[in-house]
Amino acid sequence: MNEYNVGDLISDFLFENDLKTVFGVVSVHNIPILDAIAKRNLIKFVPARGEMGAGHMADGFARSSDKVGVVITSTGPGAANVVGSLVEARFAGTPLLPVSYTHLTLPTNLSV
């Protein structure tokens, strides 16, 4: 049986909205999204060394292509590191979509 997870949903959303180039940083937290993108081979992922750089790359792409720039980040500090480029894009009027992902975890003292 094939699983359809949040990464698949995000990948499908990006493709269906003609967002076929995305920028980001590979991390353990966003692997489900990147796996789904790679599995379909319909969206180009452009890796960056840091989230801020990825955000600026997505901003530049959006400005030069008249498309929405997409940046995929890690969680926590990784997501925070993209904020500077989001602010720049906001004040420039550039459409930029930040995407971050984490797994749902339950506290260890809960029984389900």
Give residue ranges: language-model regions.
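Thiamine diphosphate
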Residues: 1-74, 78
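Aromatic/hydrophobic pocket-lining residues that form π-stacking "cages" and hydrophobic walls in ligand
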Residues: 58, 85, 102
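Active-site-proximal alpha-helical scaffold in enzymes
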Residues: 74, 83-87
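Hydrophobic or amphipathic alpha-helical targeting/insertion segments
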Residues: 89-100
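Conserved small/polar residues in nucleotide/adenosyl-binding loops
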Residues: 102-108
